[in-house]
Amino acid sequence: MKKTLSLTATIAILAVSSIGYANAGDVAKGKKVFNKCKACHTLIAGKHRIGPSLAGVFGRTAGSAKKYKFSKAMKKAGAGGLVWDEKTMAAYLMKPRKYIKGTKMTFAGLKKPVQIENLMAFLKEATK
């Protein structure tokens, strides 16, 4: 009986965690989180700063924004099939230099999952 309950609980947790960020997060709070990003990134297509523009980032192959010089590591990740979606972006933003060793991004990462959820909600809205 205990094993059945434990297995059921594990399955439920996995199901909830696999839902993703599509409907989670607060756009207004995500905009505040984006303040940490906007020193290096814009939301305007083709307008890059230290980092690439995030306009149209979801569904884009890593290292492929036009007119931006990406690190070899980011280009290699893209060539290996990395495409930005809510899950890959969230994993990257937790620990960028661990997720893609050799990335030029110096940001240490967001530590709180709620910050990432809110940022994903904002970016999905702002980069349509």
Question: Where are the regions that the model predicts?
Answer:
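Bacterial N-terminal signal peptides that target proteins for export
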Residues: 1-9
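Residue-level signal for beta-strand positions within conserved beta-sheet cores that form or flank
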Residues: 20, 50, 101-103
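C-terminal segment of classical bacterial N-terminal signal peptides
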Residues: 7-8, 14-22
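Sec-exported extracytoplasmic/periplasmic mature domains
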Residues: 35-45, 59, 79, 94-98, ...
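Electron-transfer interface patches adjacent to heme c in soluble/periplasmic c-type cytochromes
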Residues: 43-45, 56, 60-87, 107-117
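Sequence/structural segment immediately N-terminal to covalent heme-attachment motifs in c-type
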Residues: 25-49, 54
